[in-house]
């Protein structure tokens, strides 16, 4: 029996075995098929298979997920340690990210951003709030400066841990951006969930939740929580 509460948990489906871990690197060498669990769920692992129940004891059904090839390759190459490898990977990672999201117009030579989701809701946005923790908040602060400079839209950055207990007043036509490298930051997940719930209680469409998540793990908790995902394409974290 395994249970998840406010921390990530995945179940790996191996050959004649189940493997439980908090993240994919721990099981990547044993299986490439995983079953992510949601918060407050309990799983029974038996010789006949897996049974998942929510906090109301209702049976849950979902399909397993296949790991990307890059997530199964954990090799520090010829570097002394993974941190050094990741530092030297930064130019390639930045190039990969730019090539993924910036498309050049051959007629005028200008670049346009290619979002992996429908951006029609951008038209009504009047303010932006960014929720993050740690170094993600540092990146968010730089991002808020750029957003205000290029879009002219007022942008505020909040510590997710503070946002949870002292949220700003609800304002209409707000874009909420959650930033988490791992996609498993507990405070950021809780803050996004709270923002979704408090905005969903208001019937006025101007207060509806408009959400984007920036993460390195599309299949993470935040990736499942928010449908509009910007993947930073930095590869697996070790």
Where are these regions (language model features)?
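N-terminal segments that mediate ammonia production and transfer
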Residues: 1-126, 136, 145, 149-150, ...
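Glycine-rich phosphate-binding loops that contact phosphosugars or nucleotide phosphates
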Residues: 123-238
């Amino acid at each position: 029996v395994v249970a998840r509460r406010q921390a990530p948990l995945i179940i790996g489906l191996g050959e004649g075995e189940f493997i439980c871990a908090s993240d994919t690197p721990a099981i990547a060498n044993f299986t490439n098929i995983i079953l992510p669990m949601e918060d407050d769920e309990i799983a029974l692992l038996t010789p006949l298979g897996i049974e998942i129940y929510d906090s109301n004891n209702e049976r849950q059904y979902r399909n397993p997920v296949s790991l990307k090839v890059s997530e199964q390759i954990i090799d520090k190459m010829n570097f002394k340690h993974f941190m050094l490898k990741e530092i030297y990977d930064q130019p390639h990672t930045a190039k990969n990210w730019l090539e993924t999201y910036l498309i050049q117009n051959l007629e005028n030579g200008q670049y346009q951003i290619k979002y992996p989701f429908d951006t029609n809701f951008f038209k009504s946005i009047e303010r932006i709030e960014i929720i993050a923790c740690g170094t993600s908040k540092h990146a968010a602060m730089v991002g808020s400066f750029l957003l205000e400079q290029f879009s002219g839209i007022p942008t505020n950055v909040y510590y997710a841990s503070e946002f949870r207990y002292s949220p700003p007043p609800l304002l209409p036509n707000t874009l909420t951006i959650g930033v988490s490298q791992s996609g498993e930051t507990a405070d950021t997940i809780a803050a996004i969930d709270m923002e979704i719930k408090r905005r969903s209680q208001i019937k006025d469409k101007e207060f509806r939740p408009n959400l984007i998540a920036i993460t390195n793990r599309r299949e993470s908790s935040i990736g499942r929580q928010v449908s509009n995902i910007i993947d930073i394409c930095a590869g697996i974290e070790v």
